[in-house]
Each structure stands twice: as structure tokens, then as C-alpha cells.
Curated annotation (Swiss-Prot):
Localization terms from the record: Cytoplasm
A family per Pfam: RBFA
Function: One of several proteins that assist in the late maturation steps of the functional core of the 30S ribosomal subunit. Associates with free 30S ribosomal subunits (but not with 30S subunits that are part of 70S ribosomes or polysomes). Required for efficient processing of 16S rRNA. May interact with the 5'-terminal helix region of 16S rRNA.
Self-association state and partner proteins as the record states: Monomer. Binds 30S ribosomal subunits, but not 50S ribosomal subunits or 70S ribosomes.
A single cellular component GO annotation: cytosol
Alphabetical keyword list: Cytoplasm, Ribosome biogenesis
Family: Belongs to the RbfA family.
Molecular-function GO terms, alphabetical: ribosomal small subunit binding
One biological process term in Gene Ontology: maturation of SSU-rRNA
UniProt entry tagged with the keyword Cytoplasm: yes
Stated name of the protein: Ribosome-binding factor A
InterPro entries in the record: KH_dom-like_a/b, RbfA, RbfA_dom_sf
PANTHER family, alphabetized: RIBOSOME-BINDING FACTOR A, CHLOROPLASTIC-RELATED (PTHR33515:SF1)
């Protein structure tokens, strides 16, 4: 139980530290002019690797380019974030795109169809 609580706490600290580094320190042109939100961090049980999930706005065609730029900058981001989170071993971070808007869009489309059917 305490191990689970510890991982949750470290996940939260990492999410905040990585988000701050992306916002303030990364100067990559495909990253700095995008609205990037670190939605969650999933740390491995041995604390040596972390999956960092991000949502990127504008989302249409630029999200894959921005994700690739984040992956290319992962070591720098980890280095800067390690200054704010003190751990014996700072985890290797891997970025993944979290598409949080697709379920919303799907529900909105369903509601739109229902409204159209009610009118007819």
C-alpha cells in the first residue's frame, strides 16, 4: 500500500516538473508555440521509466510533429526536471499522445444526430 502511495506521489511530482520544463525551458519551435498539457505520468514499479501522456493543441495536423519533437527533447526535459524532483534515479521518460478530445467529439456528434432526429 505504501509503495502504491509513493508511486502516485512521484507521478504527481513528475507531471508538475515536466510540465514546467516544457512551458519554461524548452525552446524548440515545434514545442514552444503549442499548447501542451501533461495529462498524466505512469511510473514503472522500479521507478526507472515513466510514460508521459500529453495532449497537444492545436491538435489537427501538428500533434505528431510536436510529439516527435518532445521525444527528441526527452533527455533534456528529464535533465531539467530532475533538478526539481529529487530521486535516487531519475526515470527515463517516454512521451505518448493522449487523445482526450475524441470521446468528446464522438458524444457531441451523437447528441447532434439525436437533435436532428427529434426535429424530423
Amino acid at each position: 500500500m505504501t509503495e502504491n502511495r509513493r508511486i502516485k506521489k512521484v507521478n504527481s511530482l513528475l507531471r508538475e516538473a515536466i510540465a514546467n520544463v516544457i512551458l519554461k525551458d524548452v525552446k524548440h519551435p515545434k514545442i514552444s508555440n503549442r499548447w501542451i498539457t501533461v495529462t498524466r505520468v505512469c511510473l514503472s514499479k522500479d521507478l526507472h521509466s515513466a510514460r508521459v501522456y500529453v495532449s497537444i493543441m492545436p491538435h489537427e495536423n501538428t500533434s505528431t510533429e510536436t510529439l516527435e519533437a518532445l521525444k527528441a527533447s526527452a533527455r533534456y526535459i528529464a535533465y531539467k526536471a530532475s533538478k526539481g524532483v529529487v530521486l535516487k534515479y531519475f526515470p527515463e521518460i517516454n512521451f505518448y499522445l493522449e487523445d482526450i478530445f475524441s470521446p468528446q467529439d464522438h458524444i457531441e456528434n451523437l447528441l447532434w444526430k439525436i437533435r436532428e432526429q427529434d426535429k424530423n
